[in-house]
């Protein structure tokens, strides 16, 4: 039987950030100031594949496992708007926001790439990462079998 949530095989998210402030866009983007796009894409490339995202989810969920397959993970710049585009078979609660927040902190030099890699490769419950605000996050597409 079809279920809108559980029958999905792939989900696509877009997270919009801005490198400047534009008041009319403040409810739909996160103004992050200057960022290093190359660093963001280096971090985004680490996410691809089949990983346990325990470190990047809320821990109130009673889940059998926290593994997700990430098919695409890339940052794209268009003027002052920098979009993070990610697709995967599933996403944990707040996972995209935790990933975006942590990658932005890496870009700002406030978090180490090595720590990020370790959280992906050796997952632990982690309360010391930054969660991006909800503004900017959009579910753009869902694929069904």
Model-derived features: where do they sit?
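Structured-RNA-binding interfaces characteristic of tRNA pseudouridine synthases
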Residues: 1-145
């Amino acid at each position: 039987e079809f279920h809108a949530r559980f029958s999905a095989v792939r989900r696509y998210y877009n997270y919009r950030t801005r490198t400047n402030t534009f008041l009319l866009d403040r409810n739909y983007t996160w103004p992050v100031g200057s960022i290093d796009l190359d660093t963001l894409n280096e971090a985004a490339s680490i996410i691809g594949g089949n990983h346990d995202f325990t470190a990047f989810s809320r821990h109130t969920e009673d889940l059998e496992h926290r593994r997700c397959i990430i098919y695409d993970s890339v940052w794209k710049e268009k003027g002052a708007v920098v979009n993070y585009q990610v697709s995967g078979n599933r996403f944990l609660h707040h996972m995209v926001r935790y990933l975006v927040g942590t990658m932005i902190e890496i870009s700002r030099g406030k978090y180490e790439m090595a720590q990020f890699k370790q959280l992906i490769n050796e997952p632990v419950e982690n309360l010391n990462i930054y969660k991006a605000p909800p503004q900017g996050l959009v579910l753009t597409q869902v694929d069904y079998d």
